[in-house]
């Protein structure tokens, strides 16, 4: 007796339907694709009970003719392709001819459509079989009504989540379609209540409309570029809005959401200079690629894609993001450098022309070289460590008094001895009007400003100030008196480290490979003195990231060790210095990606106690 048998036709259809349709959001995705492919510029979605009870979609697209309506629900019927070579130039979202037939098998399906704006026709299909076909009053476009999902698939229905979770999944699909088609009006109603409305707008505005709440309505950064056969647009959140998972890394290829590991890693790699391994960016990558170079026909729900002859793509994504943040960082560091120099000149002007000095002289120019030596020792007794580089020209109408300390010496004393700078901290450049209300839990600084209360993490803030100074300082190669030998345990780490030896030299770090998995550290930057172990530990845990992460991670670690800690009690003068730096530099996040502060408005506070 034969063991191999032909399956019943209805069973074959159920198996096929189970591959394409696994929950309500799958149906919503397929129906939205059909509406978009029809050329509609207005689409409305109605969901009941997370789509399990009902999914209704209306559009004003080209519609379905009477003849096509009679066969559209049958397996492998499609208007998108005609022959095999059409698979190489797919421009539409749908193309397999499986969606409507799968939906018709596992639910009750009713379609009403018109191509003329006059007579329309309606077909109802139950369990894959036509129930009726009739003429209806005129409509403009198409209405698709799906009810009682999986009523004949009890096993599949048991695996559905509760309504609220299925609703969230449907909302995710709706947002993905809305964000990739900004030229279409979208509306979404949940249980007869209008919840989402998006009107026609530009892509950046649509991204802001759909995902802006994630970053508290701050503005997304934008990169737009074009290569041969590829158009690339990248939108990303400010780095202080990082996440602990990858859920907000989204990739859209030819207006389809796809899951592509190499591109996701490229986005993470592009943010590696500003985010740590424990944090992930909020980033949306939009790619438009000639259909000849991509293949979507490898996944039942078209979530995966295969590229042809585009090996440069991940590297370009990473490089574009890196270059953007490089420019941003240089601007921030230059602002920081200018503020430091300007504050010193302003605060210490009384050393050069005291008010009580009647002496007058001709206009003179002085050139002052500041801090040739780099000071990085742990501050003791609430001392501050700051590093000031370069030369500045100072103009004065009075000469320096001989019985007063030099300008350079006085600056060094100010920066290193907190106990002697109470008055100077009260006179910074661009002094912000704020009220320092004290230290909370020996961890937070409480500040009142413009009807808002700020709770500032003292360690994160001080850490960021030191980090920005370190990253902007001049580095000099310092040869170790006795080279340090170390080993790496992993072969992959060995290969990565060996391939990057020349790159480390650009950071004034010289490391030599002695034998397999054995290296020797010979030189380091002068600012890393006493931190050889930090560098070696970094080598031992090296992963496939850009070389710039070494500089970022290393200086973040040093800054972390130098900064005041949680449970440190600090003086009021030092606190106010940190606070003024916070407002001057507009600092939002520490080198490790954590938020530096939390704020609450007077209105919010009053509202919480029912005063508003």
Curated annotation (Swiss-Prot):
Keyword DNA damage: yes
GO BP term, example: mismatch repair
Gene Ontology terms for molecular function: ATP binding; ATP hydrolysis activity; ATP-dependent DNA damage sensor activity; mismatched DNA binding
Superkingdom as given in the UniProt entry: Bacteria
CDD domains for this protein: HATPase_MutL-MLH-PMS-like, MutL_Trans
One Pfam short name: DNA_mis_repair
One GO term describing the cellular component: mismatch repair complex
Position of the signal peptide: none
UniProtKB keywords: DNA damage, DNA repair
Role summary: This protein is involved in the repair of mismatches in DNA. It is required for dam-dependent methyl-directed DNA mismatch repair. May act as a 'molecular matchmaker', a protein that promotes the formation of a stable complex between two or more DNA-binding proteins in an ATP-dependent manner without itself being part of a final effector complex.
Family designation: Belongs to the DNA mismatch repair MutL/HexB family.
PANTHER family in the cross-refs: DNA MISMATCH REPAIR PROTEIN MLH, PMS, MUTL, DNA MISMATCH REPAIR PROTEIN MLH1
Protein name: DNA mismatch repair protein MutL
Natural source organism: Borrelia turicatae (strain 91E135)
Lineage, broadest ranks: Bacteria, Pseudomonadati, Spirochaetota, Spirochaetia, Spirochaetales
Gene: mutL
